[in-house]
């Protein structure tokens, strides 16, 4: 299996309507400040699949993704929804506030982002997968992975050299009746207090969960 997949999306609210000055914005309540839901959201992802053997039993998957939640009025700032959280498997993916959960195996969902989420996220991952068993109705595979990512509070804070990293291994079961179920054992290499020595065991359901 070899190939590429590129996805880009731009989501925007209605055209900006607020005309608050800095002084006016400071006196507004949160409900008043964000009543127009003025924002735009950009996402880009690139996935590359490369077979390393003629029988296609070993495949290297490389993924890159970036997402940004922007605003039209700097006095109002970033809306309190649609933000990014990073860590874990991202199995939740979305919540009622339209926040997005980007997986970074080896970490928990609260380990990387701020408590309210961040408007900017970036992630790079590599996974080397080997088929172990394959039939018409079932496939079992094992894999090694390395992931790098972070979230930032603004574009100014973006630092591609400041990425959290993790390594690990796992396995996946593919079956038409149950879909895809996976298990990963990962080490978050940037955890503090030597917590990186204790691996995180995490489960996934479905394909591309926790990606952009």
Task: Walk through the language-model features, giving the residues of each.
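Short Gly/Pro-enriched loop/turn and capping motifs at secondary-structure junctions
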Residues: 133, 149-151, 178, 188-192
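Conserved active-site loop/cleft motifs that coordinate metal ions or position small ligands
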Residues: 141-145, 179-186
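Short proline/glycine-enriched turn/loop segments at secondary-structure junctions
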Residues: 52-53, 158-160, 191-196
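Outer-membrane beta-barrel "beta-signal"
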Residues: 173, 198-212
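Outer-membrane beta-barrel translocator/channel fold
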Residues: 185-201
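Short glycine-rich, acidic/polar surface loops and turns
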Residues: 129, 166-172
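Outer-membrane beta-barrel transmembrane domain signature
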Residues: 103-105, 149-166
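C-terminal outer-membrane beta-barrel translocator/porin domains of Gram-negative envelope proteins
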Residues: 1-132, 137, 144, 152-154, ...
């Amino acid at each position: 299996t070899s190939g590429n997949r590129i996805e880009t999306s731009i989501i925007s609210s209605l055209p900006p309507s607020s005309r608050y000055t800095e002084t006016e914005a400071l006196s507004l309540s949160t409900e008043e400040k964000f009543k127009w839901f003025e924002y735009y959201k950009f996402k880009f992802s690139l996935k590359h699949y490369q077979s390393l053997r003629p029988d296609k039993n070993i495949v290297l998957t490389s993924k890159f993704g970036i997402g940004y939640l922007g605003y039209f009025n700097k006095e109002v700032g970033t809306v309190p929804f649609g933000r990014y959280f990073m860590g874990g498997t991202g199995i939740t993916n979305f919540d009622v506030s339209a926040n997005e959960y980007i997986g970074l195996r080896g970490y928990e969902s609260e380990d990387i982002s701020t408590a309210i989420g961040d408007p900017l996220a970036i992630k790079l991952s590599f996974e080397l997968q080997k088929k172990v068993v394959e039939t018409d109705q079932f496939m079992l595979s094992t894999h090694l992975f390395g992931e790098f990512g972070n979230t930032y509070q603004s574009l100014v804070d973006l630092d591609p050299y400041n990425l959290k990293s993790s390594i690990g291994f796992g396995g996946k079961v593919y079956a038409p009746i149950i879909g895809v179920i996976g298990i990963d054992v990962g080490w978050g290499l940037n955890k503090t207090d030597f917590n990186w020595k204790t691996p995180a065991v995490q489960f996934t359901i479905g394909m591309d969960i926790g990606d952009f």
